């Protein structure tokens, strides 16, 4: 008689159905570390993909990291491509129609907005934001508002490595 298998079979990690389930369900409930905080200086944006979702991280001059879907709400065009890395910018400008957003996600300008019928209101077109926090040396993002609290998710990390957690990643050496 064969011993019961105690681990998932290898094909579970390569099965496209499992990947879809992970991306569309299970992993949506948790925070994900996307980058080191030091990789996103103030006045920069960074395009990344998380669970097949194109994201754009920004850090305005106030130092707060923010996460948005990397697509203009007007026509869905990406603001920035991943291959560009962290990019210094004061605004996000859609390459399609030139809609211009602040790094906080506020619509600052839209082409020919006076000619819209019904009347156009900028405050109705913010960038869709996602939960985003900096904890320790990392920037964490969740893809839904219904997410496990970050403090709960990182409780064990905070207990075990609290002294290292506040250090920049380039100064941490794990043995």
Short names for language-model regions:
Residues 76, 100-101:
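FAD-binding glycine-rich core of flavoenzymes that anchor FAD
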Residues 71, 98, 145:
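A short beta-strand motif that forms part of the nucleic acid-binding face
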Residues 1-64, 101-175:
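Rieske [2Fe-2S] iron-sulfur-binding subdomain
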Residues 94-97, 132:
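Hydrophobic alpha-helical packing residues
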Residues 47-95:
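Glycine-rich active-site/cofactor-binding loop and its immediate structural neighborhood
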